[in-house]
């Protein structure tokens, strides 16, 4: 709570004003699932940051806990969704809480049928705003997909 003095209100006199609900740096919670500690130490990033009930998830890719890229596209896509599920869960959310999602695809048109099939198996349909972007490359050679999202805990 922040106090602001100095408001002179006609008929009332000098009034102190309190501002409620302001967000401070202490309201931010860094979310790191147990299985991602090595990645966070290696890459120096937070898988998610939670402010209030809103969870901002960094891009998740299909790699093993040992940071190896999974070569098979379908298995890589499944692993990316599983990594996102772990991040959401560590932040108190689930797929149904996602309100916005952006996916980045290398060789998008070649892999889109497989990606959509996997997405439809694991992610609820029509529950969020989704933007799909084709890119030339991602952080590591062999990565085909990165998924980032924003979720609001219900």
Question: What role is predicted for each listed range?
Answer:
Residues 13-82, 86-99, 105-154:
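N-terminal presequence-like segments and the immediate start of the first folded domain
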Residues 5-7, 12-15:
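Acidic, Ala/Val/Gly-enriched low-complexity intrinsically disordered segments
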